[in-house]
């Protein structure tokens, strides 16, 4: 999407309409979803938006839960938050942030991946999280009181850590 307004792309043969919008600057204080309602035309309606739900400060496409419910979208795929959320249902709309597919630093900890969505025969969307990252960023606190530090760290590390990156905090 290239325009700073909600734009539709249609695939009639799949009964699918996808809506999205692009930021025209570093911030987007007005919400793209405000006043939008998908038509009741029997199609699957999916939104792709970079934004924040119920933000305290409106800087990056603020989206209110009431707007999500009023949108009548079947699924709203959200970006901006790099930490995965569990799917949230607002009205009939399911939405979620998958996070990012690969962590880039110690401010993006844990398992990373994406959501795979399925449209059922009844039109309902189901989401499954698919781990994707080759490595994880983790912070590990190790108490070394009365222990040899290296042995304590090695004992605290999970078995599968060869590709993972750890910030290790020693206490004690």
Can you annotate each of these PLM segments?
Residues 1-118:
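His/Asp/Glu-rich metal-coordinating catalytic cores
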Residues 5-14, 96-162, 167-169:
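Binuclear metal-dependent phosphoesterase catalytic core
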């Amino acid at each position: 999407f290239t325009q700073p307004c909600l734009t539709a792309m249609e695939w009639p043969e799949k009964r699918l309409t996808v809506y999205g919008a692009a930021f025209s600057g570093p911030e987007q204080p007005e919400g793209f979803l405000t006043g939008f309602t998908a038509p009741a035309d029997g199609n699957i309606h999916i939104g792709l938006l970079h934004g924040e739900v119920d933000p305290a400060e409106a800087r990056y496409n603020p989206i209110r839960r009431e707007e999500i419910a009023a949108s009548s979208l079947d699924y709203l795929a959200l970006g901006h938050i790099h930490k995965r959320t569990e799917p949230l249902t607002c009205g009939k709309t399911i939405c979620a942030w998958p996070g990012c597919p690969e962590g880039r630093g110690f401010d993006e900890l844990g398992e990373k991946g994406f959501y795979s969505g399925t449209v059922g025969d009844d039109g309902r969307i189901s989401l499954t999280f698919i781990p994707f990252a080759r490595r994880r960023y983790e912070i590990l606190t190790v108490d070394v009181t009365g222990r040899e530090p290296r042995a304590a760290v090695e004992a605290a590390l999970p078995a599968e850590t060869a590709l993972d990156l750890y910030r290790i905090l020693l206490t004690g």
